[in-house]
Amino acid sequence: MKKSGILNRHLAGAIAELGHGDTVLVCDAGMPIPPGPRVIDLAFRAGTPSFAEVLDGLLDELVVEGATAAEEIRDANPDAAALLDVHFPWLEAVPHDELKARTAAARLVVRTGEARPYANVLLRCGVFF
C-alpha cells in the first residue's frame, strides 16, 4: 500500500500515464464534462474535497508548463482566482465557453466536490528535465 502522495488508485494510475503536452482539467462539481476524457470523480459532498485540496495534491506530483482558467473566475470566485495566481502567475484566462470546449481534448478530468463557481483549471503537463 502507498504511504504518501495520492492514495486514490485510479487517480494515481491516471497521473502515471500522463505525458508531455497532455492536459488535465481540475474542476468543480458543476463543470459539464463532455464524453471523451477519462474522468476521476472525487466528489463526495458539496465542498469535499475542495478545489484547493485536489489542486495542491496534483501539483505535488505533476510538472505543469501551462494553465488555463475561465476569465469569469476573477469576479465570481476571488478565492480560487487568488489560489491560481499563486501557483500560476502566467495563467491564461479565456472565456468560460472556450474552457469548456477545450475540455473535450483533455486526457484526464479530475472532478472535485467544490461548490463555488468557476473553480476550474486546465493544466498542461511538462517534463521534469
UniProtKB/Swiss-Prot annotation:
**One Pfam family from the UniProt entry?**
RbsD_FucU
Q: Where in the cell is it found?
A: Cytoplasm
The source's superkingdom equals Bacteria
Q: Which residues form the active site?
A: 20 (proton donor)
Provide the reaction this enzyme catalyses: beta-D-ribopyranose = beta-D-ribofuranose
Q: Residues that bind substrate, according to the entry?
A: 28, 96, 118-120
Has the keyword Ubl conjugation been applied to this entry?
Answer: no
Q: Please name the InterPro entries in this protein's record.
A: D-ribose_pyranase, RbsD-like_sf, RbsD_FucU
Annotated metabolic or biological route of this protein: Carbohydrate metabolism; D-ribose degradation; D-ribose 5-phosphate from beta-D-ribopyranose: step 1/2
- Listed disulfide bonds for this chain? none
Q: What is its EC number?
A: 5.4.99.62
Coiled-coil annotated residue ranges, if any: none
Q: What class of enzyme is it?
A: isomerase
Under Gene Ontology molecular function, one entry of this record is: D-ribose pyranase activity
Chief localisation class? cytoplasm
- Identify its protein family: Belongs to the RbsD / FucU family. RbsD subfamily.
Function in brief: Catalyzes the interconversion of beta-pyran and beta-furan forms of D-ribose.
PANTHER family attached to this UniProt entry? D-RIBOSE PYRANASE
* The protein's name: D-ribose pyranase 2
